[in-house]
Amino acid sequence: MFRKVLIANRGEIACRIAATLHEMGVRSVAVYSEADRGALHTRVCDEAQWIGAAEARDSYLNAEHVIAAAQACGAEAIHPGFGFLAENAAFAEAVEKAELTFIGPTAGQIRAMGDKREARKLAEGAGVPIVPGAEGVDAQALVRAANA
């Protein structure tokens, strides 16, 4: 069990993650940009770390800032919430490289699910029911037929 988790998100999702962490007896750390200073998620968490300017690319999407914030406050893990860095395989790898735990799928799983064909193959292999698709269809033949 972790003692402290940094939540790499804002708003309602960060508040919900913080509430769950509190129920589990785990300290929560919010991150915030200049635009979110004093926002609700920064007040419901046990701590808050500033991660950059108002633009998301300078804060919530900046993996280096998020990881540095986790290291600075002594968090053992990072929960990405959804959006922002949650589906970024390189971020998941960077978190692991920083000797922190990424709470979510592995980088390999993120990559596989990001590729529709690979995700479909994995689902079929796992016995998940899937709708029929256009496997093996000649895309060029379809284009020619549409243009005829």
Segment roles from a protein language model:
Residues 1-148:
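N-terminal beta-alpha lobe that positions the nucleotide/phosphoryl donor
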